[in-house]
């Protein structure tokens, strides 16, 4: 299967689909993205075992499709593979308790000022589960989130559902939202509290994005 990247912007009724026949370009570092255009797939930490990939193929197609599935949804896979993960024996509640205890210990000892606890859960898939259904269900369930589905042989298939609008605006100005969904959405005119500013200042974040446009207000 060829590499693809499909995304739905917050509160939109359409999705953007990109496919290419070539393998993704391997990028050595975030700095090497300077001047490049394309869709970036990057790990949290880049090293020899965690490469950055750029979808910038010459033999590529880009389409815009309605989310109602009325046309063109062959771009989104509607099949299952045979791969399955082993179900964990530890209950989600017990796993969370163990992880929280370890985190809390380091906070009490002032090893770190702030930690973000990320968890994973493995669920059995049924016969109705497919990348297409998962993407469309995510778009329906989270209308104000950025939803994306992408695949390359090098990275596997990933679904993204992000509540944050990292940057939004035009020539008149820009705005951003609290990271990690720490503020409830209450309209466009939101202001960060002193606590939110302090917490986000302690997060080491590097962002490299090739933007073809910014949404107009």
Task: Enumerate the predicted regions with their spans.
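N-terminal basic/disordered segments at the start of proteins
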Residues: 1-13
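Cytosolic ligand/metal-binding cores
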Residues: 19, 36, 165-217
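Non-catalytic accessory segments adjacent to catalytic cores
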Residues: 19-124, 129, 188, 194, ...
């Amino acid at each position: 299967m060829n590499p693809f990247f499909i995304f739905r912007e917050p509160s939109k009724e359409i999705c953007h689909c990109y496919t290419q026949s070539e393998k993704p370009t391997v990028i050595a570092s975030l700095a090497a993205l300077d001047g490049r255009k394309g869709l970036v797939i990057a790990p949290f930490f880049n090293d020899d075992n965690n490469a950055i990939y750029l979808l910038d193929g010459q033999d590529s197609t880009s389409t815009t499709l309605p989310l109602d599935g009325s046309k063109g949804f062959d771009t989104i896979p509607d099949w299952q593979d045979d791969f399955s993960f082993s179900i964990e024996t530890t209950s989600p509640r017990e796993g969370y308790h163990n992880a929280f205890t370890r985190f809390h210990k380091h906070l009490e000892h002032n090893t770190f000022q702030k930690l973000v606890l990320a968890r994973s859960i493995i669920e059995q898939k049924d016969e109705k589960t497919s990348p297409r259904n998962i993407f469309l269900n995510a778009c329906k369930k989270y209308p104000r989130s950025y939803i994306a589905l992408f695949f390359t042989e090098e990275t596997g298939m990933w679904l993204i559902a992000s509540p944050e609008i990292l940057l939004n605006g035009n020539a008149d100005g820009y705005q951003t939202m609290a990271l990690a969904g720490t503020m409830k959405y209450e309209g466009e005119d939101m202001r960060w509290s002193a606590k939110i500013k302090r917490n986000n200042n302690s997060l080491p974040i590097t962002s490299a994005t090739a933007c073809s446009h910014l949404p107009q207000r």
